[in-house]
Structures are given as structure tokens and as C-alpha cells.
From Swiss-Prot:
KW Transmembrane (keyword) present: no
Top enzyme class: ligase
EC number in record: 6.3.2.9
One Pfam family hit: Mur_ligase_M
Molecular function, one GO term: ATP binding
Lineage: Bacteria, Pseudomonadati, Campylobacterota, Epsilonproteobacteria, Campylobacterales
Entry's family note: Belongs to the MurCDEF family.
GO process annotations (BP): cell division; cell wall organization; peptidoglycan biosynthetic process; regulation of cell shape
Name by which UniProt lists this protein: UDP-N-acetylmuramoylalanine--D-glutamate ligase
Residues holding ATP: G97, T98, N99, G100, K101, T102, T103
Length: 402
């Protein structure tokens, strides 16, 4: 059986490295490969022009591999890593949505690791490296993965709210939503899906629990929010993690939940040498994440760094939302001019900075001790950085130099 891997990302590399003895050697196609060669394990590294669909039995893409790519168009036996590993997948919980996937997945694993739960998918470990004998897989599941998945399904699907994101990849918001909901049609009567009330009528055999907001979800599961130390925008993530625990174990471990430590790059606060507050929210790559960050600091004047790769999303609603705040904007990235245009139409004061270091320096000229400087860019980072993590690191380095 010949398996072709599309893209040389974390997912496909893990498959190639861990399963080469069982299924390899693999043919790995990537636009960055200009000539045919072998890696140290004997896998072939090929340019996409060399792909012959008649010589391939299975094609597995990296999750973010664009659906319009010629390899996807030619593939006859396309399947996601979820489908590929489904036959050995133990009981699983999939967590998706636009914002909060990572935090909810980490919190749920924190609550359930004592029963043998392991974390993977879009966060942590690729499926190729997960223990198939673990009691439970808790998988952060992206819309990209769901788009390519047609066989696999979880026992519990926890869907956080959906807002516009990755529209240039999916083609439209409706396509994005449909990919998020696609797994419901494969779930059965023994499965459980938790989803926003707006999608409550989506056909499925699974037991549905719909919620309007975090308060409603807490009521549905008998969760006392006063016992949770996390506040918005992380409160919903915490409630969802507890809901998953409640379904599986019929327990609510508040103390264990409250011992969870948040990861960096999400509303990560730091002070400069003048004791002024700066917030690294580099992971906020869409409008709903930025709105949540703004609401957290609504009682302060906000100096917001915004911009990057906007992924084809219309951010007009975000800028209209900003009218409710005492806010000044600092535009960066490839979308600098677009951000300035949004700001002008919304009658918001904005500075043209283009690069992150200039934005930090410009803010430093205006920022007072009782105000907040916020990197919550509403855009992806790949126009100027290798990742959102690098963007956050550079931001903190710039702040520490002040």
C-alpha cells in the first residue's frame, strides 16, 4: 500500500517518522521540495508536480493544506489523520470552535489525566505519537481537520461558539460552520454533543445539549460558577471542561480545575520598567478573541496593536465594536493600510506603525500607568513572523527594552 503525505508539517512528519517501518517508505509532497531526494528514514521528498494519483492508495494532507491545491484536486483517496488512525483510536473527546479550543482541551486533560486521558490533535501531540492504549484521547480539533475527516467520530464533541475565521481557506463563513458541524452526522445514539443553541437543530443521532452562553451551560450541568477562579474569556472554557468531566465521571472537580495554569500568549500580563501594564494576546487571531480581550479591559484606556494577515475576513464589525471603548489603535503587518481604513471609517484614532517594534515604541510615548497596552491583533502572524508564538516573544522583548 502506497501512502502519500501532502505537506511537510508536524502531522505528516510524525506519520512519516513513526510509521515508516509499518507503512513506509512514504511519498511526501511539498511545494518547498524542488528536487526529489530521500530523508534519513528513506521517505521520498517530492515536488507536487511529481504526484501520480494512479500510484497512490491513500493521501493524507497536513490539516492546514489548502483544499484548492492541485494535490487535493488530483487525490482520489484523501483522508485526514483522524480517519487514518480511527481504527486504533480509543474513546475520544473532540473539542472545536473558533476561540478557546486549546484552553478547553488543556483544562479537560488536566481534569481527566488521572484516568489515563492524553492530549493531542491541534495542540500537543500528533495522533501518530499518541498511545493507542490510552483510556481516552482528548483532541483539539480544527476546522481544517474536520474538513478532511469523513469516517472518524468522537464519543463526545464539545463545540465552542463559532465566529468568522479562516474564510480565505474555507471560502465562506457558511462553509466554515458546516465543516465544524460535519461530524454530527456520523455520531450515534450513545454519543454526546455540546453545541451553541444556534446550531441545536443540526441533524444528529447523538444526544444534544445546547447552550446560549456560559451561564446557560453552567446551569445545564449543575456547575457553580462561584467556585471557578477563571473569569471571562476563560470562564466558558472552564465550564466546558467541567461539563466533559461531568459526562464521563459524574464529578465536578473545582479545586483541580482551579489549579490549572494558563499557557503563555493568551492575555499574558507583564509590566515594563515604569510599572505600566502590557498584555500579550498574540494568539487572538480573529475578531471574537479580540472582543473578549477588549471586554476584559473595558474600564481602562486601551492602546491596541492590530494587524497582520487578516485571512480574508471582514473586520468591520470589530471596528464598530471598538466605538464603545476608550481606545487608540496601532496598525502593523501586511494589512496596515486596511486597518487604517477600517479605523478611519469607524472614526477611531490610529497610528501607522507597520512593524511590531515601532508600535511598541509609539505606545510607550502615550501609555500611562492606569492604561493598558494590548497586543490582540485579530490577524494571523505569518506575514512577518514564523508563528503567533514568535510574535508574542518579539512583543515581550520590545517591552522589556523600554
Amino acid at each position: 500500500m502506497k501512502i502519500s503525505l501532502f505537506g511537510y508539517g508536524k502531522t505528516t512528519r510524525a506519520i512519516a517518522e513513526n510509521l515508516v517501518d509499518k507503512f513506509g517508505p512514504f511519498d511526501i509532497y511539498d511545494d518547498h521540495f524542488t528536487e526529489t531526494k530521500k530523508d534519513t528514514l528513506g521517505n521520498l521528498l517530492l515536488n507536487p508536480n511529481d504526484f501520480d494519483d494512479n500510484l497512490s492508495d491513500i493521501e493524507i494532507p497536513s490539516p492546514g493544506f489548502p483544499p484548492k491545491h492541485k494535490l487535493i484536486q488530483k487525490a482520489k483517496n484523501l483522508q485526514s489523520e483522524y480517519d487514518f488512525f480511527y481504527d486504533i483510536m480509543p474513546k475520544s473527546v473532540w473539542i472545536s470552535g473558533t476561540n478557546g479550543k486549546t484552553t478547553t482541551t488543556q483544562m479537560a486533560t488536566h481534569l481527566l489525566s488521572h484516568i489515563g486521558a492524553v492530549i493531542g490533535g491541534n495542540v500537543g501531540t500528533p495522533l501518530a505519537e499518541l498511545d493507542p492504549y490510552a483510556k481516552l484521547w482528548i483532541l483539539e480539533t480544527s476546522s481544517f481537520t474536520l474538513h478532511y475527516t469523513h469516517k472518524a467520530k468522537p464519543e463526545i464533541y464539545a463545540l465552542l461558539p463559532i465566529s468568522p475565521d479562516h474564510l480565505s481557506w474555507h471560502g465562506s463563513f457558511d462553509n466554515y460552520v458546516q465543516d465544524k458541524l460535519s461530524v454530527l452526522k456520523r455520531m450515534n445514539e450513545c454519543d454526546v454533543v455540546i453545541l451553541p443553541k444556534i446550531y441545536a437543530n443540526t441533524p444528529t443521532k447523538a444526544h444534544k445539549i445546547s447552550y446560549k452562553d456560559e451561564k446557560d451551560l453552567a446551569v445545564k450541568f449543575g456547575i457553580d460558577t462561584e467556585k471557578i477562579s477563571f473569569k471571562s474569556p476563560f470562564l466558558l472554557d472552564a465550564i466546558m471542561a467541567l461539563a466533559i468531566e461531568k459526562i464521563l465521571l459524574d464529578t465536578l472537580s473545582y479545586e483541580l480545575l482551579n489549579s490549572f495554569v494558563m499557557e503563555k500568549n493568551k492575555l499574558e500580563e507583564l509590566k515594563d520598567s515604569q510599572n505600566r501594564l502590557w498584555v500579550n494576546d498574540t494568539k487572538a487571531t480573529n475578531e471574537s478573541a479580540v472582543m473578549a480581550a477588549l471586554n476584559r479591559y473595558k474600564d481602562k484606556k486601551i492602546h491596541l496593536i492590530i494587524g497582520g494577515d487578516d485571512k480574508g475576513v471582514d473586520l468591520s464589525n470589530l471596528f464598530d465594536f471598538m466605538k464603545n471603548f476608550n481606545i487608540e489603535l496601532y496598525a502593523i503587518g501586511i494589512s496596515t493600510e486596511k486597518m487604517l481604513d477600517y479605523a478611519k471609517k469607524a472614526n477611531l484614532k490610529a497610528y501607522k506603525c507597520e512593524v511590531l517594534s515601532k508600535a511598541v515604541n509609539e505606545i510607550s510615548n502615550h501609555l500611562r500607568v492606569n492604561e493598558v497596552a494590548l497586543l490582540s491583533p485579530a490577524c494571523a502572524s505569518l506575514d512577518q513572523f514564523n508563528s503567533y508564538v514568535e510574535r508574542g516573544k518579539v512583543f515581550k522583548e520590545c517591552v522589556n527594552k523600554i
